[in-house]
């Protein structure tokens, strides 16, 4: 574990002592408490490979004094200094082998004002035990001693009894323990053990345990309303508050089934009332929201479930982990990542003779899980507490937002508990003001004419300016208009009338541009078809589009089943015939369809999206204005015409007086050719997908000053964003589905800034909403909905799909929103962060997987030029595969795969490290320039170190493998197989590391094992450590085992504590008995 892990399992309290303090009496009182309770004289030591609790007699506790009296009379300054000192003392590491695991510090502020700071480790003390310590400390100080001063039941006795020891026979123990196991197995069957709350930073590979708190308070009046409401419904305030917290968690985490950890005192036996030790347990309570209960139903369900939790709360958390065998998660707490607690406030004061004592919690600056809500019922009826959050994951503003949402949900419970959980308003504004939740790109300055009239208007002003060119020819604006007029006349003669569809199946170039414009000049609908697409796809598109005319390279070689009249593009786009007149120009209405763009459908059949002339004109007006395109610009067109973003390339320059330079389709496939074309004289702008830009950069291309670089079509990887931002170009990340007309949002790519899709373009508005189209708060993941003039007409001949995706805008009557199916979140700075797809949430072993994050880590590996990732067998034995394009020889060295996996383990959570790696010559791209993930499986050379079995070869490997086989109950294991992938879990890992030390003399740090849990890595470590000295246990005078050797750093807390108290198996040694395992929870 890391250093913070040892610090995270500490408790600290501050006692303000006002009056005449007798320091000697206080020291004696504290020593008496330590002497009375064995747990406070207990240390943790390795004995015969087992981490054992050792009770040591004659332990003394010191009470050093710090004099702050000279810091000045300012009370606020003194209080700040005390809080700084308290935090410092609470975060100081522990030597777990050397009791007492309790320490004190006395700060003198004035002769009549002292502050006592007490810190104790969770290994020997829980929250109720700390209350006992405080009470007895003050009773001892007054000279009376603990009330009812009989010898308390010691913690070691409790452990023996709780584990079914013979010294304290309990005939019902076995039956009770079995019933608990059956209860938890049944209750938690199928429950997700990961709650993915939206975080402000990427989760580190190892849980950091660093934390902070924000206050949560319900004043007396509000708290009384909660109590009254709960009493009327026969439930407790605990359940009502828990329900509100659950709703906040579920709605923020996008979960309908989650586990919340509940601390349980676990002191049902009367004899345990005065016992000091770690008796508490933390039990998961399952909140099942899959049926979308009302708030009232949720409260009742949680109340009923609490009964089962409390009845079976004595099953130790470690045994529960062993029972559930959750996936390896060194980056987060197992089973649950959120906690809740409510108790009577023990932070009260005492009036002693001559001394007033006030007690206050100390914020230790840690967080054992992602998020914890701990509340206390105060004497005046108010409910006060804090929300503790993992500061490695969340900003304070995010935690404050969670706290505000808790109040919002509570008010809705009290106001109307008939509201379904899915309908709860986290924003708290109510539907009347949800229009403010839209992010608006601002108005368009003035309406534009439709595209063809706009081009004709510019041609009249700049007839000799170059309009379009390819490798074979170039046309100025006047020639372009003449060609389009002639082509439109031929289309009309071929049977294409106003409103008819015209399919253009041709290579990119000047002729394709003329054919496209001729469709509109003739009043028709443009339907681009990629000639490089497979024949079955081309046939499906033509079948659905049913064009009146098919424009193609050679009518005799086209799909045999189409019924359209075929026209050769060479004939169509030739110069006008001598004497040919100009045909009448139809006047399409703004809302008539301009083009039909086919995209991939979930059923395997392409779906056609109909986009109007007004959609297209508004988009071009908005984005060309945003990019400030003008007559001086020359845009290199790289994209296939069957991808809607090509329309920006072909039309953006033509509606602003610039020039389109059309590259052949081969330009995207050859890095050198691509780089050369981008570097051509005069090219000022280009648009491409991330994969194509990476290809250009790999060939050494660098944009010149003033170059405008447009990137979109798929998620922009952060590493590529950094590369683009480092160039002199003005780089933009663009986002938009075909259904909202090409691009809807844009963001400047700047050095050092996170990747976002920015804000809407002018005229567009977007909403981040839940499934019921209610706005979600900033930071919360939701579906992106797009409104405005870019929202397309709908899907061709598919009214049901159109109605499902193009929905009425509930906040702008008469308008529509398009449901993109993309998951985003609105950041606090107003920028939109793309998260993933609603319908393509990839999960592997219970974890949500972001392939883009994995790919960024793969590309950061030494010698790797490009990479992609995919999930193999997502419905069966799901596993992540990484595909690497590397420098020559970079992946050929022996052990390279293992080193790559180690590097990945340091950059990614364990759940995201690919289990298989492949070397490939290039990442496959589809015709649109996007990564073709479907083409990845089955390609490339498998790198050794994946899941194929490699037998042990060295003595150390054979020894380690034998231990694995024994613990995992397997006949054999390979040296590169993953311990956790074979069924191991954290408790077995603890057993394994103890056996390695006992049998092989190697003390392996837990963190090192978790980074690469393979036989090969362990064997190498064992070989290095096998010379370590074995420690021999001896006996204390009272018969308790003790070590004579000085504890090693691994036994120490801040000095390298290797043990995580929620999951490690520990033992208590008592006179005349063998070590008894003890499971410890958070």
Swiss-Prot record:
On whether DNA-binding is a keyword of this UniProt record, the answer is no
The protein here is known as Nonribosomal peptide synthase SfmB
Cited SUPFAM superfamilies? Acetyl-CoA synthetase-like, ACP-like, CoA-dependent acyltransferases
Quick one: where's region Disordered?
1027-1082
GO biological process terms on file:
amino acid activation for nonribosomal peptide biosynthetic process; enterobactin biosynthetic process; lipid biosynthetic process
- PROSITE patterns xref list: AMP_BINDING (PS00455), CARRIER (PS50075), PHOSPHOPANTETHEINE (PS00012)
Species of provenance = Streptomyces lavendulae
Lineage, uppermost ranks = Bacteria, Bacillati, Actinomycetota, Actinomycetes, Kitasatosporales
For the null mutant, the annotation states: Inactivation of the gene completely abolishes the ability to produce SFM-A.
User: Which pathway or pathways does this protein act in?
Assistant: Antibiotic biosynthesis
InterPro entries in UniProt: AA_adenyl_dom, AB_hydrolase_fold, ACP-like_sf, AMP-bd_C, AMP-bd_C_sf, AMP-binding_CS, AMP-dep_synth/lig_dom, ANL_N_sf
Extract the GO molecular function terms from the UniProt entry.
2,3-dihydroxybenzoate-serine ligase activity; phosphopantetheine binding
Q: Where is the composition biased (Basic and acidic residues)?
A: 1037-1055
- Kindly list the positions at which O-(pantetheine 4'-phosphoryl)serine occurs in this protein: 986
Q: Which cofactor does it need?
A: pantetheine 4'-phosphate
Instruction: List residues of the Carrier domain.
Output: 951-1026
Which keywords annotate this record?
A: Antibiotic biosynthesis, Ligase, Phosphopantetheine, Phosphoprotein
* SMART domains tied to this protein: PKS_PP
Annotated family: Belongs to the ATP-dependent AMP-binding enzyme family.
Role this protein plays: Involved in the biosynthesis of saframycin A (SFM-A), a potent antitumor antibiotic that belongs to the tetrahydroisoquinoline family. Specifically adenylates glycine and loads it onto its peptidyl carrier domain, via a thioester linkage to the phosphopanthetheine moiety.
Is-annotated flag, keyword Transmembrane? no
What Enzyme Commission number(s) apply to this enzyme? 6.2.1.66
The protein's annotated catalytic reaction(s) are: holo-[peptidyl-carrier protein] + glycine + ATP = glycyl-[peptidyl-carrier protein] + AMP + diphosphate
GO terms for cellular component = cytosol; enterobactin synthetase complex
